[in-house]
Amino acid sequence: MPVTMSRRAYAGMFGPTTGDKIRLADTELLIEVERDFTIYGEEVKFGGGKVIRDGMGQSQRSRAEGAVDTLITNVVILDHTGVVKADVGLKDGRIAAIGKGGNPDIQPGVTITIGPGTEIIAGEGKILTAGGVDTHIHFIAPQQIEEALCSGVTTMLGGGSGPAEGTKATTCTSGPWHMMRMMQAAESLPMNIGFFGKGNASKPAALIEMVEAGACGLKLHEDWGTTPAAIDCCLSVCDALDVQATLHSDTLNESGFVETTIAAFKGRTIHAFHTEGAGGGHAPDIIKVVGEQNVLPSSTNPTRPFTRNTLDEHLDMLMVCHHLDPHIAEDIAFAESRIRKETIAAEDILHDLGALSMFSSDSQAMGRVGEVVIRCWQTADKMKRQRGALPEDISGNDNFRARRYIAKYTINPAIAHGISHVVGSVEPGKLADLVLWSPAFFGVKPDLVLKGGSIAYALMGDANASIPTPQPVHYRPMFASFGRSLIESSLIFVSAVSIERGVGARYGLSRPLEAVRGTRGSISKKSMILNDATPVMEVDPETYEVRADGELLTCEPADVLPMAQRYFLF
């Protein structure tokens, strides 16, 4: 017999549906459900007296007959593709289907079969996103992995070998021996990981050696000498072996200016780190590369968004990270040349225009590994407050802006580094690296973090309590963070040539290796989903004012941010 429910009652029972709006944390951003794949009156829900019971919402079908391993019920998916409500089926550690879960023997429209072997994760009233992809990691301390996971990041690409001075300043795992040791260490970490070799060399042999040893990319860093010759050599090796090149250019303009570096690219694809420049790069105008079709530009999170405290914290941070001496005038001048309020303000707007394509952390090296997601949404909120709704958001929601910003730390870095075939979005066939959020805590504190379809980290109460919720509730490792489950639930991203050369067996690795692919001529700025703008960039060398297509880009620093202190009282 049909029953009519109010929207409020329906949302309370089954979560929001088409036309309902959801506020993201304490921001001014509202997303609206565009489509609901579930069927009214046929929704499935787990619990006493609920639908998913034998002969009701649960069929008799075995796993071999098509039942999924896990079903996330009635969840709102926020992805670069849109905002939809659906059931999400997981099987073999992958996303199997997005649609309508249930018992196909008695329910209409079922596209995902629930069987006796199906586990249920309740998604009612929750938001599901893809795990974040952080492509600027200094692997200084293994404790970064826990911080990143608890923020919603499930893939980390970068370089280093621990708290050595080279690693504290540059994202490079230098040489085959360190590459081997870091890949062996990654076996015990519940995170997808890939390592960049050092890209600074004028002859190719040593660079080829590192890629053959397992590097999934090469990093050019000014502290090792990012000269035109090194850039050209590095890009040539990357083109030959299909790995991405990443750039931290010459702040001091010793070997040339930004135009010299652009010329050295010769139109070849490169990922430009901290493109604004406070994190490093040609002073004061590295931001010009935003307008180049072959440059994939990203930000690191210390300058995100521009606040009244941004400039003050950067000087000391920079001195430590780059091994500078506060008693040497030239070192002070070097540091001060990188910190400019004008370019940092412009960075906010370039993100909102979709001209800056990606977010990353720069972990412990002028960046906070657990704040990629937070800083991204804080920037989106600041831009809505200062610039209003985007032209594409004409329906009273912020769906387009939300899609643009989530793409910056999910699908776009995955595309840039040749791993979008397995991670970066909530799509069938991809690794089930998923993050479940309560809307009030969206972007700040996830409820669950899944790795390869299993729960790796979660908010969990006292383990000696009679139920899971008594205090103290904090993040704790779950079963996918232990034993063989840990090994099988995550990947190490490597070059294809290293797999051909058998590095897994040579290093004694048990974890699956996944080759990066399609990182070179097949991608460009046009590949950056919802973030592919290439404005003509100008920077005044005296005032540092930034213009895009002739328009001055400036905004005020924020005094107050959402997703901040009220969420971290304890």
UniProtKB/Swiss-Prot annotation:
HAMAP family listed in its UniProt record: Urease_alpha (MF_01953)
Binding-site residues, Ni(2+) 1: H136, H138, K219, D362
UniProt-listed Gene3D superfamilies: Metal-dependent hydrolases (3.20.20.140), Urease, subunit C, domain 1 (2.30.40.10)
Keyword line: Cytoplasm, Hydrolase, Metal-binding, Nickel
GO cellular component terms attached to this protein's record: cytoplasm
Organism listed in the record: Methylocella silvestris (strain DSM 15510 / CIP 108128 / LMG 27833 / NCIMB 13906 / BL2)
Name recorded for this polypeptide: Urease subunit alpha
Cofactor(s) essential for the protein: Ni cation
Residues the entry annotates as binding substrate: H221
Entry note: cofactor: Binds 2 nickel ions per subunit.
Name of the gene encoding the protein in the UniProt record: ureC
Binding site residues for Ni(2+) 2: K219, H248, H274
Transmembrane residue ranges: none
